[in-house]
Amino acid sequence: EFSKNPPQASSTRETDIGVYINTRNSKVIPIMEFEAKRFSETSNNQEYVYGERGGIERFKKGEHSKHLKECGMFAYVQSRTIEEWFSKVNGWVIYQSQNSINESIDWTEDEQLAKVSLLGSVEKFASCHKRNISNDTIFLWHYFIDLTP
């Protein structure tokens, strides 16, 4: 079962998509959640990584999917190329690792996205991030979807 904007335990933030298993006793168990962002000329593109609505940052802080160890993000590429956005995202991760003033988050260069596979107009990446709040890590799958004309 899929759900839009699943609620988060102990957070007012919501992810965009939740994937659940319905058990025989009607208990719903979340197994994966996804955050989605647009890459375009008019979006605040750095928020894929950090900022008030920062996708990766919310997973790192435990504002998204605190109860899960593996989740994902969708990037809707509406301008430029997937390769350009991949480079920019990794540049923003490096920037945060060298310049972050947020003491509740530790960024490292090891948190850059790594290429996994190309599936037609979708490129798949992976990253792993430290979560200070729970002293563990979260693994993220990243799907960059080419929507350019």
Labelled PLM ranges:
Residues 1-30:
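Active-site metal-binding core of divalent-cation-utilizing nuclease and nuclease-like domains
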Residues 15-17, 49-62:
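A Trp-anchored, charged/polar loop motif used as the substrate-binding/catalytic surface
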Residues 17, 32-40, 59:
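Conserved catalytic cores of phosphodiester-cleaving nucleases, focusing on short active-site segments
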Residues 21-23, 42-48:
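An N-terminal domain-start capping segment
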Residues 30-35, 46-53:
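"Short basic amphipathic alpha-helical interaction patches in structured regions
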Residues 39, 78-81:
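Short acidic/polar capping segments at secondary-structure boundaries
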Residues 45-50, 62-70, 80-149:
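C-terminal tail/extension regions appended to the core domain(s) of diverse proteins
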